[in-house]
């Protein structure tokens, strides 16, 4: 692996690690309004990344199909969505709002919370992996800066995600060090998923458009299933989640256009 590839793959994990370290500098549990802001920002980044870094390149790479160039993006998107839906049903986990999902289990609540975030980090790792694969294969629609832009965007949105995991664990009585470790571990799956996807894409170059849209479908599933409900939680109406959705969306858009 070359240096740029390693940096691109590890940046999102660094974002999660730094976010998890908030347990050492923040005293209290995250307020509802703060969680709305963080969830909205993360959702905005993921939606923009799904469109500019994944779906549009998937369609561009299929342009030889003419009017049917939408088919790989359409099919991959649905497969990615259904894949995350399946994982949600078969893996026991607890959402940030303490709602349990998946089969009954004796696992601790903290373990199921980390499982939930780990589960939803898989498509982010795949997204980084598939754009890196496109860059390494000298794909015209994706270059090194485009892959780096996606990686930076996901790293930025992983910072609040790391805090969203570690802070509630600390507030439930877990030591700061253990809460930090658990938050960090939730992000380990991202570089692992990225490396696996890079290797798989090397064998499956003809289906790269399907892999790009697969990652997009999986990421947008997470946005709708997890982040949008969180940015609108509570009985008091607030537009903060929506405003920071726009902030995250435009930031990722600028990153992709400026660097890609």
Residue ranges and their predicted role:
Residues 1-260:
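Intrinsically disordered, metal-sensing/regulatory segments
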